[in-house]
Swiss-Prot record:
Residues making up the signal peptide according to the UniProt record: none
Pfam families, sorted: NADHdh
Protein name: NADH-ubiquinone oxidoreductase chain 1
Job description of the protein: Core subunit of the mitochondrial membrane respiratory chain NADH dehydrogenase (Complex I) that is believed to belong to the minimal assembly required for catalysis. Complex I functions in the transfer of electrons from NADH to the respiratory chain. The immediate electron acceptor for the enzyme is believed to be ubiquinone.
Lineage: Eukaryota, Metazoa, Chordata, Craniata, Vertebrata
Underlying gene: MT-ND1
Length: 117
């Protein structure tokens, strides 16, 4: 029984995280489009119709790039810190009062202020 609960929490967490990441990708696309119009350029319009597949192309490019690590850096810290930064950014979304919330915080607003600072 506890395994079923853990799987359901994992699924709920993924159902929270994936739309947030997709929204961030497309908001970045909108930002790039607006900045390109301000600079009298066309902006990202190569990949897909009107550049709608540009966030996917950016993600693929990010994953196939060769990781270059400074020789004096710690390998563990160099790999873990971007993951920790993403985790902290996504943690700010946890106490939002959605129909199936992940946690029930009495001080949800205080938690959101603390995580965003």
């Amino acid at each position: 029984m506890p395994q079923t609960t853990m799987v359901s929490y994992l699924i709920m967490a993924l159902l929270y995280i994936i739309p947030i990441l997709i929204a961030v990708a497309f908001l970045t696309l909108v930002e790039r489009k607006i900045l390109s119009y301000m600079q009298s350029r066309k902006g990202p319009n190569i990949v897909g119709p009107f550049g709608l597949l540009q966030p996917i192309a950016d993600g693929i490019k990010l994953f196939i790039k060769e990781p270059i690590r400074p020789s004096t850096s710690s390998p563990l810290l160099f790999i873990m810190m971007p993951m920790l930064a993403l985790l902290l950014a996504l943690t700010a979304w946890v106490p939002l009062p959605l129909p199936f919330s992940l946690v029930d915080l009495n001080l949800g607003v205080l938690f959101m202020v603390a995580m965003s600072s």
